C-alpha cells in the first residue's frame, strides 16, 4: 500500500557548496536581493536516517520527472515538513530552480521566495541557522534483508526545508548570495566615495 514517505537531508557537507550560480542568478542577487541555496537533496542506494533505501534507478527516474516541474516553475517546497501529499501554497518558501544527479546523489538549487514562509527562511539563513532539506513522496516499501526498500511505485512530490535532516550531508548552503551582496555594497561605497571626491 502506498504511503507518504518523507526523508531529511543536510544540504552541503560542512555547510559550503561549490558556486552553482549562473551569471543571471548573480545579477538577480545584486539587483533584486534574491537568495539561492544549494546542496544535496536526496541520495539513492544508501540507508538513510529513517532506515529506508531508495534504489538509484528509482531516484534517477523521479529526478527526470521532477526536472519537468523545475522547467515549468512548479517545483515548490514548504518550510517544515507536513504530513500531506499536497503542497500547501500558503506555506511555500522556495522553488527548486535546478536539479541533477551527481552519481547516486540528487543535487539541487533552490530560490528563496518572497512569501511569508520564504521571509522566515531568509531570516533563518541570514542568522546563520543550518537548514536541511527533506524529500516528500508517495510510495510503497518492502523489507529485504533487514532493510526497508522503497518500491517502484514511488513518486517524488517535493523537497521541503527542515531543521533535522535524516541523511548526513543534506544541509543547504547559501549560494554566494550574501557574498555577492557584500561585494555590491563595497562597490557602491567606493563609487559613492569617488563621486563625492569628483564633486568637490
Spans of model-derived segments:
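Compositionally biased, intrinsically disordered/low-complexity regions enriched for serine, proline
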Residues: 52-53, 79, 162
Amino acid at each position: 500500500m502506498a504511503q507518504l514517505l518523507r526523508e531529511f537531508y543536510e544540504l552541503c557537507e560542512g555547510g559550503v557548496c561549490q558556486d552553482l550560480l549562473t551569471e543571471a542568478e548573480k545579477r538577480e542577487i545584486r539587483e533584486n536581493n534574491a537568495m539561492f541555496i544549494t546542496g544535496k537533496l536526496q541520495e539513492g542506494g544508501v540507508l538513510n536516517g529513517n532506515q529506508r533505501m531508495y534504489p538509484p534507478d528509482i531516484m534517477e527516474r523521479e529526478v527526470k520527472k521532477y526536472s519537468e516541474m523545475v522547467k515549468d516553475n512548479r517545483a515548490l517546497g514548504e518550510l517544515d515538513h507536513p504530513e500531506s501529499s499536497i503542497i500547501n501554497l500558503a506555506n511555500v518558501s522556495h522553488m527548486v530552480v535546478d536539479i541533477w544527479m551527481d552519481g547516486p546523489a540528487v543535487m539541487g538549487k533552490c530560490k528563496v521566495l518572497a512569501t511569508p514562509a520564504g521571509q522566515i527562511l531568509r531570516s533563518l539563513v541570514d542568522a546563520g541557522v543550518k537548514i536541511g532539506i527533506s524529500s516528500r513522496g508517495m510510495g510503497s516499501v518492502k523489507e529485504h534483508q533487514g532493510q526497508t526498500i522503497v518500491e517502484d511505485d514511488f513518486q517524488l512530490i517535493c523537497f521541503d526545508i527542515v531543521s533535522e535532516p535524516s541523511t548526513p550531508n543534506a544541509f543547504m548552503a547559501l549560494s554566494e548570495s550574501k557574498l555577492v551582496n557584500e561585494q555590491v555594497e563595497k562597490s557602491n561605497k567606493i563609487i559613492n566615495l569617488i563621486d563625492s571626491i569628483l564633486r568637490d
